[in-house]
């Protein structure tokens, strides 16, 4: 079971990772450390040659049974740290500003605890220390490598700075939004700015398209569903006295329900093309699917709550986040459940002064160990 020495070890691992962050698909030293720490506990590491970074490990219980997976992401962000911590990043321009160092150390702790509880495991627990979550590419690599073959369910977490330590946010259904990107190119006819009647002004059309897109959600998506359309870049022209040939805009759409995700782009296309045509211009609409939404399987809600209760921790109804998470790609393949882990942080994710309370390390380690035991006892 967890004790002071265990907690101290988790802190040391987390601080080591924090001091030496590595960007997506560059987590070479991070991978070596994870392997070493697991090998020190005689935990089996699976050979997955398709993964150049990241670690897949496994603990088999003394009883045959299903295989479940627990995932932790391991990459950092291109951010200059401003925490002034004694263990602040030693890598210029790179920081664990989203707490993946916390996730990694915690789930190594879970593996350590479950290694001591093999007799209780009615099946196998596979640990996925995943690279490149920040660029939404790591989960795809893990799936392509076949790591989820034969796995019945997968579990994961994200630290939550606005929840106190010892509090876990749980809910069934949508938790994090789908993430998609769009581009719109408005093609007009360039000319002299003083003679606009001889041109087709793509900027004028673009302005109206921006306004028109604001109605896509409010007038086309159910008020019982959530969706956001954000235009984040608009570009046109190179000179103050020339009407350009075209204008461009791009942005992101966030949704929680599949129905909304499917409906939004067609409404956007109709608005863009219709308004452009009214100005005598043409609109070319492009849609780039990025990530689905995190959808928690309600089958595991009771287990997620029971694990916390057994340990004396509190669960609360998790608030949805419009952020994206490539854990959702696993959930497209197998059932899964993702939780918020309270860390009582000072700043939100991706902030250069992001910190968290290290007391949450042991909480997270214990929680996922208990959850694994319960799920393997109850999974159909």
From Swiss-Prot:
Protein source organism: Bacillus subtilis (strain 168)
Enzyme class: hydrolase
Phenotype upon loss of function: Cells lacking this gene do not lose the ability to grow on 2SC as the sulfur source because of the presence of other deacetylases that can compensate for scmP (yxeP) deficiency. In a triple mutant lacking this gene, ytnL and yhaA, the levels of NAC highly increases after addition of 2SC.
Recorded family membership: Belongs to the peptidase M20 family.
Protein name (database record): N-acetylcysteine deacetylase
Reactions catalysed, as given in the entry: N-acetyl-L-cysteine + H2O = L-cysteine + acetate
Function: Probably catalyzes the deacetylation of N-acetylcysteine (NAC) to acetate and cysteine. Is involved in a S-(2-succino)cysteine (2SC) degradation pathway that allows B.subtilis to grow on 2SC as a sole sulfur source, via its metabolization to cysteine.
Binding residues for Ni(2+) 2: 98, 100, 158
Cofactor: a divalent metal cation
Free-text comment on the cofactor: Binds 2 divalent metal cations per subunit.
GO molecular function annotations of the record: hydrolase activity; metal ion binding
Binding site for Ni(2+) 1: 98, 134, 350
Keywords, alphabetical: Amino-acid biosynthesis, Cysteine biosynthesis, Hydrolase, Metal-binding, Nickel
Pathway(s) annotated for this protein in UniProt: Amino-acid biosynthesis; L-cysteine biosynthesis
InterPro entries membership: Amidohydrolase (IPR017439), Bact_exopeptidase_dim_dom (IPR036264), Peptidase_M20 (IPR002933), Peptidase_M20_dimer (IPR011650), YxeP-like (IPR033846)
EC number: 3.5.1.-
CDD domains, alphabetized: M20_Acy1_YxeP-like (cd05669)
GO biological process assignments: cysteine biosynthetic process
């Amino acid at each position: 079971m967890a004790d002071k020495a265990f907690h101290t070890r988790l802190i040391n691992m987390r601080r080591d990772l924090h001091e030496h962050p590595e960007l997506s698909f560059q987590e070479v030293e991070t991978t070596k450390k994870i392997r070493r720490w697991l090998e020190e506990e005689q935990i089996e590491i699976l050979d997955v040659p398709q993964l150049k970074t990241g670690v897949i490990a496994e603990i088999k219980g003394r009883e045959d049974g299903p295989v479940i997976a627990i995932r932790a992401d391991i990459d950092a962000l291109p951010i200059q740290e401003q925490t002034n911590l004694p263990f602040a990043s030693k890598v210029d321009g790179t920081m664990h500003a989203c707490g993946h160092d916390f996730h990694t150390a915690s789930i190594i702790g879970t593996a350590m605890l479950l290694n001591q509880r093999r007799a209780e495991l009615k099946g196998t627990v596979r640990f996925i220390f995943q690279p490149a979550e920040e660029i939404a590419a790591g989960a795809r690599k893990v799936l392509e490598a076949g790591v989820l073959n034969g796995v019945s369910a997968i579990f994961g977490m994200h630290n939550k700075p606005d929840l106190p330590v010892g509090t876990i946010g749980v809910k069934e259904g949508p938790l994090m939004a789908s993430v998609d990107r769009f581009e719109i190119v408005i093609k007009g006819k360039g000319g002299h700015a003083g003679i606009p009647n001889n041109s087709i002004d793509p900027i004028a059309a673009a302005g109206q398209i921006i306004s028109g897109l604001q109605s896509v959600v409010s007038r086309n998506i159910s008020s019982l569903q959530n969706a956001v359309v954000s235009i984040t870049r608009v570009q046109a022209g190179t000179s103050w006295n020339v009407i350009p040939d075209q204008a461009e805009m791009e942005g992101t759409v966030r949704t929680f329900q599949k129905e909304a995700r499917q409906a939004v782009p067609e409404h956007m296309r109709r608005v863009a093309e219709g308004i452009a045509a009214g100005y005598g211009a043409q609109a070319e609409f492009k849609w780039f699917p990025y990530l689905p939404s995190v959808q928690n399987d309600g089958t595991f809600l009771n287990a997620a709550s029971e694990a916390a209760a057994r340990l004396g921790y509190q669960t609360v109804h998790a608030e949805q986040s419009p952020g994206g998470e490539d854990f959702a790609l696993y959930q497209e393949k197998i059932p899964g459940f993702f939780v918020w882990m309270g860390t009582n942080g000072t700043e939100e994710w991706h902030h250069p002064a992001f910190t968290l309370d290290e007391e949450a390390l042991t909480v997270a380690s214990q929680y996922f160990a208990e959850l694994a035991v319960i799920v393997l006892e109850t999974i159909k």
